[in-house]
Design a protein with these regions (language model features):
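Short, small/polar residue-rich loop motifs at catalytic or cofactor-binding pockets
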Residues: 21-23
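Conserved acetyl-CoA-binding loop-helix of GNAT-fold acetyltransferases
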Residues: 62-75
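Cytosolic beta-strand hydrophobic patch enriched in CBS
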Residues: 26-30, 86
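Active-site beta-strand termini and strand-to-loop segments that position acidic
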Residues: 30-32, 112-114
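Conserved active-site alpha-helix within GNAT-family acetyltransferase domains
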Residues: 79, 83, 89-112
Length: 121
């Protein structure tokens, strides 16, 4: 677990580290005896699951590791009978290459940065 936490720490602000214990399935990619990537599947219901905490060590990026990890999450979701799989990401083109799409009919998540935020009063 320490190796996984170390990998996730390489991506501060990009991965939700506090939710690591809540994931349903967690997958790792290895090179020899080293963990070089990880990805989690969070199942919310019989219908919906999320691909999350996807990380690949910078020395091993652009070699298909991330795609294999997402494919494994997708396989697990299918095995569990999940109907819809989503990812919250800033790398939309990566997920689009794997068959994910943005649905305009869905609600949009809106965020407000509160650190340093001052009230209008």
């Amino acid at each position: 677990m320490a190796a996984i936490r170390g990998l996730i720490r390489l991506f501060p602000g990009q991965l939700v580290q506090k939710n690591l214990p809540r994931v349903t399935s967690f997958f790792v990619a290895t090179a020899g005896d080293k963990i070089i990537g990880c990805c989690a599947l969070q199942v919310y219901s019989k219908r919906l699951a999320e691909v999350r905490s996807l990380a690949v060590h910078p020395d091993h990026q652009e070699h298909g590791v991330a795609a294999k990890l997402v494919e494994r999450c997708t396989e697990r979701a299918r095995e569990e009978g999940i109907k819809e799989l989503f990812a919250v990401t800033s790398r939309t083109s990566f997920f689009e290459r794997l068959g994910f799409a943005t649905f305009r009919r869905e609600k949009t998540a809106m965020f407000l940065e509160l650190s340093g935020h001052t009230s209008a009063e």
